[in-house]
Amino acid sequence: MKTLVVYYSKTGNARKVAGIVINELDGCDSSELLFDEKANTIEGAKDPSGFDRVIMVCPIWAFSLSTPMKLYLKQYGGAIQNYSLIVTCGGLGLSGCVRNCVKATGKQPLGAMKIRNKQLRADNFDIKPML
């Protein structure tokens, strides 16, 4: 299965999780989204149309996907065949993120997972079900 890991990280938490996913999925492709806040644009986005599955990793912002991931989905959501979502956060917001993804892709995720910041700091999480 050809997999693309797409991630955005402002503080490094989502980047850490994406790195673990990439290491576990030896041979997958990855794309780090670079966000220009002033222009509200992203760079570094790869077209997901040639991939069987996309794993998206990003922080939750205000009970929703981070703006860079929303921009990615606005541009490429229709090209995503199958996807999983992993979000990092301080608390709540997974259901809002899933709604964002379903709206952009027209599909339910294969899986969705929230990793709280305290779990991340303690390395107390298991991403294997998302792989």
Question: PLM ranges: what are they?
Answer:
Residues M1-Q75, N124-L131:
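N-terminal beta1-alpha1-beta2 submodule of the flavodoxin-like/Rossmannoid cofactor-binding fold
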Residues L110-L131:
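Glycine-rich phosphate/pyrophosphate-binding loop and the adjoining helix
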Residues N13, W61, G90-G93, Q119:
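Glycine-/small-residue-rich active-site loops that bind phosphorylated ligands and cofactors
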Residues V21, L25-D26, A79, A104-Q108:
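Short, structured coil segments at secondary-structure junctions
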Residues C28-E32, Q108-I115:
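Short beta-strand elements in bilobed, periplasmic/extracellular small-molecule ligand-binding domains
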Residues F63-G93:
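Mid-chain, well-packed structural core segment of small domains
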Residues G96-G106:
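Short, aromatic/basic amphipathic alpha-helical patches
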